[in-house]
Amino acid sequence: ALGGVLKALAKGLPSVISWINQK
């Protein structure tokens, strides 16, 4: 379960970074 959470986090990080850069 923890591995899946880490994978989802790693997958969502680029989106968060690009969202922050757009501000």
UniProtKB/Swiss-Prot annotation:
It is found in: Secreted. Disulfide bonds: none annotated. InterPro entries: Melittin/Api_allergen. It comes from the Eukaryota. The keyword Secreted applies. Coiled coil: none annotated. It holds the Pfam family Melittin. The modification Lysine amide is found at residue 23. Expressed by the skin glands. Keywords: Amidation, Secreted. One of its GO terms (cellular component) is extracellular region. It comes from Rana arvalis. This is Melittin-related peptide AK-23-1. GO terms for molecular function: protein kinase inhibitor activity. The keyword Secreted applies.
